[in-house]
Amino acid sequence: LLFLSDMIKKESGGIINISSLASYQALPYFTVYSSSKAYVTSFTLGLYEEYRESGVKILCVCPGYTKTNFNIRAKMSSKPLAGYLMSSEEVVDQSLKAYSKGKYLIINGKINKFAKFFTSLIPTSWSLKLSRSIIKKGMDEKNW
């Protein structure tokens, strides 16, 4: 927000905040991560609505699992989701396209959009159990 007032005066500029698909539900074993990403999403969408007529573009990027070192640092295998991982370059490309179109939110990748939609249809308790199962399987994986 340091430069937001200057952008508003110029009626141009932009903010891109990186959140996560994890911002849309609590993730067992990654509670702090999903909670902090929920804050980023809520904060960014709130800013967007406050300043939508200011000429400043504000975008919240919510990628799902992406091919990065995150899994290594989290001591978790990416094998259970290997076929669904996007490259960071794909995430950036999609995000910049969304930004250039003036969108305020992007959930990167079709599988991630489906996952968000699907989890909104099922009871929270099921969604939590499903997340726990997927994450636990990745944490238990020995060959990564």
Report each predicted region and the residues it spans.
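Active-site helix of classical SDR
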Residues: 36
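SDR active-site lid
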Residues: 50-114, 125
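Residue(s) in the substrate-gating loop at a strand-loop-helix junction
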Residues: 20
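A short helix-coil junction within the Rossmann-fold of NAD(P)-dependent oxidoreductases
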Residues: 2-11
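Rossmann-fold scaffold of SDR-type NAD(P)-dependent oxidoreductases
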Residues: 17
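Active-site loop immediately N-terminal to the catalytic Tyr-X3-Lys motif
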Residues: 27-31
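Active-site-adjacent segment of SDR/Rossmann-fold oxidoreductases
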Residues: 6-7, 25, 46-57
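A short, exposed helix-loop element centered on a Lys and neighboring polar residues
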Residues: 1, 45
